Amino acid sequence: MEKSISNWPDGRKLTVMVTIMFEVWSEGKAPPYSPMTTSLKSGTPDLLGISWSQYGGKTGIWRFMRILDDTDINATVCLNAKAAELFPDAVKRLHARGHEIAGHSYTQDLVLPYLTLEEEKDVI
């Protein structure tokens, strides 16, 4: 027996959920992966990785917003609280345009399971 889905708009049989990750790392930190193919010596700041990690708030999210505006699509944007602190204009614009804002920790390098209960409460 074929199952019928009749509650999608216009009888459509497929829906797509657009989710954008708007992530930042703590100051001076970079993602654990890097566009660099050669490992840096211990203690050397990964300036390329840091710059790469800042691209999302400075350029990437604005490009996504233009695409979403042009296609009249709303998205769920998972963002770190630090991203909201660093890029408040972007977050205000996302909210004003009707995109859903979803909490996604404080920063990407903060891993809650590695914290004590007290440290976790402080973060929250």
Where are the model-predicted features located?
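Catalytic alpha-helical scaffold of carbohydrate-active enzymes acting on polysaccharides/glycoconjugates
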Residues: 1-124
